[in-house]
Amino acid sequence: MRIDIMTLFPDTVGDVLSESILGRAQERGILRIETHQIRDYTANRQNQVDDYPYGGGHGAVLQADPLYRCWCHVCDEAGAPVHTIYLSPAGHVFDQSDARRLAKMDNLVFVCGHYEDRKSVV
């Protein structure tokens, strides 16, 4: 199984996922986890990924372009269809049935926004 994680904090995420059961699975070649820095896919010198929500509102949202470019790169690297999951506090609560279903998939992509939301065009 291959798991790709798109995040603004790849070092932190990578360190955590190299420990315990997941670390041993990677050592045995059962699991491959790759982290991807979303900022590497921006079109500006500042590597800015945040934007203001359309129509106003509080907080910041992730720009669509860097997310899309990063996701395309991940899909190309995987070389096979991927199942993409956008992690959000407003989303579905992960449970055991989700774990069983996802464990059967070969390529998973987790998008870690670390923001209240993302542009709705994503």
List each model region and its residues.
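N-terminal nucleotide/polyanion-binding subdomain common to many enzyme families
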Residues: M1-C75
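Conserved small/polar residues in nucleotide/adenosyl-binding loops
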Residues: S120-V122
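S-adenosyl-L-methionine/SAH cofactor-binding core of RNA-modifying enzymes
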Residues: Q63-C112
